[in-house]
């Protein structure tokens, strides 16, 4: 029988006969980029087509600390994963076009808002794969124009636009790029036509249609009729009429729509493609020669590894996604005898999510201790005797029908203890005794629950959460995993070693910010999500390093500087042989001085003020010099906790 037990040192353990590897689902969310070796260590294989080229994350963390003098937390980035993702997406659409006889081309356009860092864009451009770039603001467009280089590149310009934005885009067209200005609101068309006339250039226009269809999940509001962007059906007709009046209907060449980010259900994709294909058909009837069909983003990744349509998972694979898009558009074209347009996808998350993993150390562990207690004194308050009677009953009875009643009775008594303590009827020692006995009761009863009994599941979760180790991790949730805080997104998190060991402990992770929101609330646990993280056995004074996986999309860009914790150190790694990792780029994380300057505090002036205070103190000269030196070193140090 599969039991839910509490170990001898007091922590709850579900799936005790399963290994951490099995319950953390790395076989699924790892996508062959991450897996566990025979020693139980997580390794990274940046190119799954070359499985012999891999390296242990633990060894990599040790290497970067030894060779670069880096401190944890450190973000490890693998450009080869990005390039493999790009190839995989291109290959999936190539195969789908061949299977369905689709006559148009396919083009992946990377929306740089997902991660604008130089290393990402350069890795994509240097991959040798066909690639376009998408910008959603003036600043992004400036970056895209520079990265586009001297070769002809497809550039898609989304977002709201002013005159300068439009002019920069048209300049890109004159420089030889295919720049599509996607009309998000009708007022933009006048700006485009005016600036195009000034520059004597024919603009390439796109239109974003606001669909009735929308995806489900955390990002569903970015699609559908209530979407922030896009034109309604009547506005699309108005746009067509305006272009006819200006005799430039042939400028409208691209149809764009967006169902929402991280689409979990493939049926939502099929529904959206079907509706947007109707726009394509109707626009052709109006004389608009649409050449490009931009289905936007939405290609999801399986953060949970359970292959469902939940918010942080997907019930489809890359090939099924490509099949759905290609077949849906191709079917509409065949039915109406229309040309097959070039299909564009803006799959940023699907390209970048897997390439980055944050590795950090645990700087403190808090565990519940279970102690042997003596019976209360005869003259002790009755509530203490009541709790003791429950304890004695558990030791002698062991009747499973009493499991819940024992928990409930002890909870009621403990509440009574707190009330009596608050009014002075119990002293501190009596309160401490009662709280410890309550822990012992929960520990003892917890061994008798069976996880297979559905009726036990809720109380099992409560006990696991109550007795979980608290791991204080050297990172800022707000800086490194902002979506975990802001929208409760789940990311795969687990130790990077000993994953071949059975689950023997549970843990919750807390960051080092002075904010109670700085905790991770949900963790992968087999086919489900729980509020505690499965852990192998570890010594309290030697906790394992932890890996936060699939943080390559949005997290670096959205991260904020709560408590003035800055960017972590970043390492770009190439793997070309087994256990051979090459560090090709290392960027030190923000220093304390960097973060102070962000809030307009001049480190030099701060140092002058330290010096002034020290000079007016009564410190001995040697100590004064030491203090000033240490403060200066501190200004130039890492914002995260450093080893001695």
From Swiss-Prot:
Modified sites of kind N6-(pyridoxal phosphate)lysine: 113
A molecular function annotated in GO for this UniProt entry is:
metal ion binding
Write down the Pfam families for this protein, in alphabetical order. Arg_decarb_HB, Arg_decarbox_C, Orn_Arg_deC_N
Q: Which reaction does it catalyse?
A: L-arginine + H(+) = agmatine + CO2
The biological process GO terms on file are: arginine catabolic process; putrescine biosynthetic process from arginine; spermidine biosynthetic process
Gene3D superfamilies according to UniProt? 1.10.287.3440, 1.20.58.930, Alanine racemase, Lyase, Ornithine Decarboxylase, Chain A, domain 1
- Indicate which residues the UniProt annotation says bind substrate: 293-303
Q: What is its EC number?
A: 4.1.1.19
Q: Which cofactor names does the annotation list?
A: Mg(2+); pyridoxal 5'-phosphate
Q: Which domain of life is it from?
A: Bacteria
Write the protein's name: Biosynthetic arginine decarboxylase
* UniProt enzyme class: lyase
Establish whether keyword Chloroplast is in the entry.
Answer: no
């Amino acid at each position: 029988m599969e039991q839910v037990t509490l170990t001898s040192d007091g922590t709850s353990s579900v799936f005790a006969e399963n290994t951490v590897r099995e319950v953390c689902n790395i076989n699924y969310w790892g996508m062959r980029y991450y897996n566990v070796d025979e020693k139980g260590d997580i390794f990274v294989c940046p190119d799954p087509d070359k499985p012999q080229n891999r390296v242990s994350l633990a060894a990599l963390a040790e290497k970067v600390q030894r060779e670069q003098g880096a401190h944890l937390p450190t973000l490890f980035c693998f450009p080869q994963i990005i390039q493999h993702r790009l190839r995989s997406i291109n290959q999936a659409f190539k195969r789908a076009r061949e299977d369905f006889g689709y006559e148009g081309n396919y083009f992946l356009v990377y929306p740089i808002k997902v991660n604008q860092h130089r290393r990402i864009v350069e890795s994509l451009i240097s991959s040798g794969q066909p690639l376009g770039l998408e910008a959603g603001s003036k600043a992004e467009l400036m970056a895209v124009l520079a990265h586009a280089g001297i070769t002809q590149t497809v550039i898609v310009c989304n977002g709201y636009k002013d005159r300068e934005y439009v002019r920069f885009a048209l300049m890109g067209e004159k420089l030889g790029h295919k720049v599509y200005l996607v009309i998000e609101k009708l007022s933009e068309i006048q700006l485009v036509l005016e600036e195009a006339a000034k520059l004597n250039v024919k603009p390439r226009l796109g239109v974003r249609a606001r669909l009735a269809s929308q995806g489900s999940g955390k990002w569903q509001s970015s699609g559908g009729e209530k979407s922030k962007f896009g034109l309604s059906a009547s506005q699309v007709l108005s746009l067509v009429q305006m272009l006819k009046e200006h005799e430039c209907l042939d400028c409208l060449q691209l149809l764009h729509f967006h169902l929402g980010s991280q689409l979990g259900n493939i049926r939502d994709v099929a529904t959206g493609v079907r509706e947007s294909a109707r726009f394509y058909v109707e626009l052709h009837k109006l004389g608009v020669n649409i050449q490009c069909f931009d289905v936007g983003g939405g290609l999801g990744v399986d953060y949970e590894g359970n292959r469902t349509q939940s918010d942080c998972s997907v019930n489809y694979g890359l090939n099924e996604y490509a099949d759905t898009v290609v077949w849906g558009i191709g079917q509409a074209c065949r039915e109406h005898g229309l040309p097959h347009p070039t299909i564009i996808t803006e799959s940023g998350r699907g390209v970048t999510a897997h390439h980055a993993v944050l590795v950090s150390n645990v700087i403190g562990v808090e565990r519940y201790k279970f102690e042997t207690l003596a019976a209360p004194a005869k003259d002790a308050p009755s509530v203490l005797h009541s709790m003791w009677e429950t304890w004695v009953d558990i030791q002698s009875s062991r009747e499973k029908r009493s499991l819940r009643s024992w928990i409930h009775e002890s909870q009621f008594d403990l509440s009574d203890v707190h009330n009596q303590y608050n009014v002075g009827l119990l002293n501190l020692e009596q309160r401490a005794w009662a709280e410890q006995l309550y822990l012992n009761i929960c520990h003892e009863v917890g061994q008798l629950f069976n996880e297979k009994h559905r009726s036990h599941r809720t109380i099992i979760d409560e006990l696991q959460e109550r007795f979980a180790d608290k791991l204080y991790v050297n990172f800022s949730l707000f800086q490194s995993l902002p979506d975990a805080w802001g929208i409760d997104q789940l990311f795969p998190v687990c130790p990077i070693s000993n994953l071949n060991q059975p689950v023997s402990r549970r843990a919750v992770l807390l960051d080092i910010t002075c904010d109670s929101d700085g905790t991770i609330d949900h963790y992968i646990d087999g086919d489900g999500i729980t509020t505690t993280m499965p852990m192998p056995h570890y010594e309290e004074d030697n906790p394992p390093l932890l890996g936060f996986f699939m943080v390559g999309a949005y997290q670096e860009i959205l991260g904020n500087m709560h408590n003035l914790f800055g960017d972590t150190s970043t390492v770009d790694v190439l793997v070309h042989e087994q256990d051979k990792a090459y560090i090709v780029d290392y960027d030190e994380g923000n220093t304390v001085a960097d973060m102070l300057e962000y809030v307009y505090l001049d480190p030099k002036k701060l140092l002058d003020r330290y010096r002034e205070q020290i000079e007016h103190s009564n410190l001995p000269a040697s100590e004064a010099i030491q203090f000033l030196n240490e403060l200066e070193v501190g200004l130039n140090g890492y914002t995260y906790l450093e080893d001695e």
